[in-house]
Amino acid sequence: MLNLGCGHGADFLPFRQGFELWGLDFSSQMLQQAQKYSTKFNFHATLMTADMLSLPFSNHTFDWAIAVAAYHHIKSQNEREVAFRELKRVLKPGGEAFLTVWNRGQPRFWLKSPEQEIPWRLRGKTVYRHYHLFSYSELKTLLARAGFDILAISPEKSYHLPLKSFSRNICALVRK
């Protein structure tokens, strides 16, 4: 199973048994944290520094992939399309991927641009991270353009309001 934008490794936990785990992140510091996390929770993952725009794998390598809070960090529409096509390329026929992105419909972003630089505190300093805020229709369009069969698009499970438009995250399950 490929974990794109694996960060510090927490999203590996549900898959630590029964899967060969691969994790990619553009940040070598996050991969160091993922290595520590895998040791702490007693699982092995092959970790690599890589870019989602050019995945370092042959075609049809993975049965499964996840990308939790990764694609919304890609800055341009064209690059997001390239990244989704790359995901499709490395999935085996019939392979499935689960991904989450931030939702543009969150009330805190109603009057703001879909391109945001969000401040984060890191080791006592403020750093800014890029976020593209997706709409449900935009995500569906990009995934369809990449050639995926869309199995489901919905708010995160913890969201309970009747209008999905206001959820924090959009979740998608796709099949090649």
Residue ranges and their predicted role:
Residues 1-3, 7-54, 78, 82-85, ...:
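Class I (Rossmann-like) S-adenosyl-L-methionine-dependent methyltransferase catalytic domain
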Residues 28, 59, 72, 76:
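Active-site acidic-Proline motif in GNAT/NAT acetyltransferases
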Residues 36-39, 63, 67:
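Short, amphipathic alpha-helix enriched in basic
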Residues 53-65:
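A short acidic, Gly/Pro-enriched loop at the edge of an enzyme's catalytic core
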Residues 64-78:
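A short SAM/SAH-binding and catalytic strip from SAM-dependent methyltransferases
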Residues 89:
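Basic phosphate/pyrophosphate-binding loop/patch that engages nucleotide-derived ligands
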